[in-house]
């Protein structure tokens, strides 16, 4: 009886090992359809980034496409509430984040608003984002996409947020 048990156990372990090896080989040899983007930012975002860098670059750090889930944390709460609130920010990001150069403290979020921000669903999303930033006491500055930006005016608008 013990001999049959050991034979069965050996075959069982070999079967599990074979499954693991096959799964590993499938993953190792898998082809994924992902392609590298030519640029992280859209043309409008890139133009705005370089203007921001020109007026702020020596004094602040400028990050792009920062996930809100990396900006904000939730205090201790029950799991249901945690997932409810976490899901609201999980896949959202802000276009730019201005941070203190010394300690990388977030100072100001910037949203570059194009025509898509006029759509009903986008307005609702923007209102939610604005409310989250307000409650977290992190200012958010919305600016319309433009072919060009007056650097002095833009700097004054940003300074109005006390950075």
Question: What is the meaning of each model-derived region?
Answer:
Residues 77, 155-160:
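Short low-complexity, flexible loop/linker segments enriched in glycine and/or proline
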């Amino acid at each position: 009886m013990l001999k049959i048990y050991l034979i069965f156990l050996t075959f069982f372990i070999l079967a599990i090992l074979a499954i693991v090896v096959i799964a590993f080989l499938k993953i190792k040899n898998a082809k994924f359809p992902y392609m590298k983007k030519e640029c992280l930012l859209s043309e409008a975002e890139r133009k705005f980034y370089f203007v921001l860098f020109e007026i702020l670059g020596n004094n602040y750090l400028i990050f792009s496409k920062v996930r809100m889930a990396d900006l904000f944390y939730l205090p201790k709460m029950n799991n249901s509430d945690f997932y409810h609130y976490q899901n609201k920010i999980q896949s959202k990001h802000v276009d730019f984040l201005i941070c203190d150069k010394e300690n990388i403290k977030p100072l100001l979020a910037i949203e570059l608003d194009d025509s898509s921000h006029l759509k009903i669903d986008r307005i609702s999303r923007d209102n939610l984002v604005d409310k989250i930033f307000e409650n977290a006491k992190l200012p958010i500055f919305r600016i319309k996409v433009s072919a060009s930006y007056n650097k002095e005016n833009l700097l004054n608008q940003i300074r109005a947020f006390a950075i």
